[in-house]
UniProtKB/Swiss-Prot annotation:
The lineage of its organism: Eukaryota, Viridiplantae, Streptophyta, Embryophyta, Tracheophyta. It comes from Arabidopsis thaliana. The gene is FOX3. This is Berberine bridge enzyme-like 5. Binds 1 FAD per subunit in a bicovalent manner. The keyword Flavoprotein applies. GO terms for molecular function: FAD binding; oxidoreductase activity. The FAD cofactor is bound via a bicovalent 6-S-cysteinyl, 8alpha-N1-histidyl FAD linkage.
Amino acid sequence: MKALFSVLCLVLLVSILRAAVTKPDSGIFTGCLRNRTSLENPITDAIFTSRNTTTFLSSYVSYTKNKRYSSLNYQKLVAIVAAKHVSHVQATVVCAKANGIQLRIRSGGHDYEGLSYTSSVPFVILDMYNLRSITVDVSSKKAWVQAGATLGELYTKINEASQTLAFPAGVCPTVGVGGHITGGGFGNLMRKFGITVDHVIDAQLIGVNGKLLDRATMGEDLFWAIRGGGGASFGVILSWKINLVEVPKILTVFKVSKTLEQGGTDVLYKWQLVATKVPEDLFIRAWPQIVKGTKLGERTIGVVFFAQFLGPTDKLMEIMSQSLPELGLRREDCHEMSWFNTTLFWANYPVGTPTRVLLDRPSTPGEFFKSKSDNIKKPIPKEGLEKIWKTMLKFNFVWIEFNPYGGVMDRIPATATAFPHRKGNLFNLQYSTIWLDAKETENKLTMMKELYEVAGPYVSSNPREALFNFRDFDIGINPSGLNVDEAKIYGYKYFLGNLKRLMDVKAKCDPDNFFKNEQSILPARVM
C-alpha cells in the first residue's frame, strides 16, 4: 500500500510540473486568506499549496476515496485549506469568490464521482476534517456534530453518552457527516425512524457572502433545501443539530447467504414481497454478489441477507418464520448486541472486533470504483433477476444492495425535506464494482452501463430515479453550470418534484451561482 501511495504521489507531482502555468498564482489567494483572518486564529498552518509539494500531495490524497479521480485535473488545484476555525471557512469562501476560483468542499471524500476534490477549472479544496467536534446532550436527546466528523466518530460519541440512544444514518464509519446528512443519508434504522434529514433540527452554514447562518437567519426555505438537496449547492455546512432516537439495550442481527443453487433467486423474490411489510423494527438488506461455486473454478451468485431487529432473538425468529421462512433462519445465525456494536456488524467487521476501529481514518487512497442507483416500485420478476445474474457474472467483482423502504418512510411526505423518495417505493438498488488497475477503467464503466441497462425494464421510469448520495455522472452532468437541459435531467432524477423549489431557493441564496459543480442545483432564472 505504501508503494502504491508513493507511485500515486509521483504521478501527481508530474501533473503539477507539467501544468504549473495553467492555474492562478496561489500567492494571491493565500494572501487574501491571511488578510481576512486574525492572529488569534491563524490560518497559515491550514493552507497547503504546491510550493510545499510533499504536504500538498499527502493532504490531497488522504481524503481521496475514488482513485478514478485521484489525479484527474489535479493541475487545476490552487490550494487546499484544511480549516481549523469558522473564520477559515468564511475567508476561503470570500477569497475564492473574489479571485474567480471554484470551491470544492470535502468532509470525508466519499463523493462517488469525486466532486469534493476535482474540477476542470482552477479550484480550491476546503477540507473540513479538522472541524469534527461532537456534543451530545442526553437529557434533551440532541447533539451538535461538525461537518468534518465521521459517522464512526458520531456513533462513538453517542455511545459514550448513552447506550440507548442512536442516530439513523449510514453503515460506513469513515463517511463524513457533512455530505452524508445533507444528501439524505439512510441506513438500517430508516424503516423505524426515517433518514438523516428527518432528524436535523438546526444547522450552521457559511453563505455566499461569508456570513455564518443558522436556521433562524438562513430561513426555512434554505433550511429545507440543505436537508436532502445537497449543501454544496447552497453554501458550506459547518455543523448539524440532530435529534437522537431511543433504541433498546439489546438488538439482534444476522447474516445468512443463499446461492442460486440453494434457491437464492426464490428467496430474494419472496423478500421483495415482504421486506417493506414486516414490522418496522426489522430491516433486512439483500446483497447479491459473485461467490465461488461448488465446483473448482466455478462462480455463482450468492445473495446475502443482512438484518437488524430492534429486539431479542425470540421475537425475531417468530417474525421470520411467518414472513420469510424460505430463508431458513436458525437461532445460531442470530447475534444479540447493543446498537453501538451493530455498527461494527454493518461495517462488515467480525463479531468481537474492538470498537476503536470506528475511529480509524485511512490515510491512503481508496480503490477505483463506480456505483449507480435505482428505485423499485414493483417486484422484479424471477426472469428479470436471472438476467441480472447473467450480466453480473461477466464481472470479476460486483454487487447490488437491495435496501427496503416501507415503515415510517411511507408516512413522511415527499415534500417534507428535499429528499423525495418516500411512499411508493419498495426498495432501492445500489450497483457497485471496484478494481485495482487503471487500465481496466473503461471496460468496467462500460460493463456497469450494461448492468444498468439490463435492470432498466424493472425499475422506476419517467424519470428513472436516482439517489443523490450515490452520485452518478452517467445520468447527466453540467460542466459549465449553465446547461439547462442536462441540469433538468439529473435534477429530476435526484429530486423529482422538489427540483423547482430547490432552484427557487438557489436563486435567492446564491443568485450568481458561485457554489456549483457538475451536478449542482441551478438558480431558477438560469433554468
